[in-house]
Amino acid sequence: PTDPGFVDATERISEIDQEKLKWLEYYKLKFKGTWYTKLVGKMVLRPSAEFGFLGAYNPDRGIVPFERFFLGGDGLGSYSLDGREVIALRGYPNQSLSSIDGNAIYNKFSLELRYPITLKQLASIYALTFVEAGAAYDNFRSYNPFQLKRSAGLGLRIFMPAFGLLGIDFGYGFDPVLGGIQPNGWETHFIIGQQF
């Protein structure tokens, strides 16, 4: 008996038009804007906005199955051979807010409030609270920059020159993941060597 969840890759490869993918023609546009504003004392506000688009030079070939955007999670699950780009959205499991094949468009908005606990040279430590929202789409017909998956939470970051940035976040996803009906709830995210 075979597992109904098992997919034989050789059958799926035969369904793909190999000539269509002989020469991959695509372009990828990304925008990311981040600002740091000192509020009161040591408290810093960090708003940011991101947008990404994957397009095709030749509409007859369509968008390539590689280099697509996968939204959700901490961004650490991006080690794959298909060139996927994982866009972190705390409060949700990794890659849970995109279709199984990824998406061609994404947008993400963040607002983070940071407070440094210590700024020593050997170890800088700061606490943060955040709100984030984002979504991924297949094309501009389904694109709606106001229909977003939302989350909020708090975290802690430690920067040590020998190890880089380490951190932990606790995020609450207010919306269901794809195929779900209940809010996602709390997720724990570990941060290693990257900056949100």
Q: Model-found features: residue ranges?
A:
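Repeated loop/turn-to-beta-strand initiation elements of outer-membrane beta-barrel proteins
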Residues: 41-45, 118-121, 158-168
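C-terminal outer-membrane beta-barrel translocator/porin domains of Gram-negative envelope proteins
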Residues: 1-117, 129-130, 137-139, 193
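Outer-membrane beta-barrel "beta-signal"
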Residues: 158, 184-196
